[in-house]
């Protein structure tokens, strides 16, 4: 049941130890090494007020074939700018 798994995932992330484990799982990764190994088409999206926006240009320079689509919505682009987010994904997927 997808809804149950989603709820349990969110509850675990909110839990004190779960939150630390989640952040460790993310931030302990060697993102640069993993990113450099990627060979698939890449769509890079971020809003100017997103915490990751300052890294958008660097990510594009590391993967010159990537497609960059700025959107709006701070750290919640799919929620706050769903039309631009969906349009960028549709364009990227050619649908």
Regions found by a protein language model. Give the residues of each.
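Conserved loop-alpha-helix segment in the C-terminal half of the alpha/beta-hydrolase fold
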Residues: 41-79
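A short acidic, amphipathic alpha-helical/loop segment
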Residues: 34, 55-58, 84
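Post-His helix in hydrolase/transferase enzymes
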Residues: 78-93
């Amino acid at each position: 049941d997808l809804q149950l798994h989603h709820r349990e995932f969110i509850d675990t992330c909110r839990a004190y130890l779960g939150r630390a484990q989640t952040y460790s799982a993310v931030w302990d990764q060697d993102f640069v090494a993993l990113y450099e190994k990627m060979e698939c088409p890449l769509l890079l999206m971020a809003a100017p007020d997103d915490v990751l926006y300052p890294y958008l240009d660097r990510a594009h320079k590391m993967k010159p074939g990537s497609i960059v689509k700025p959107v709006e919505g701070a750290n919640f682009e799919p929620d706050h700018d769903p039309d631009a987010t969906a349009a960028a994904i549709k364009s990227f997927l050619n649908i």
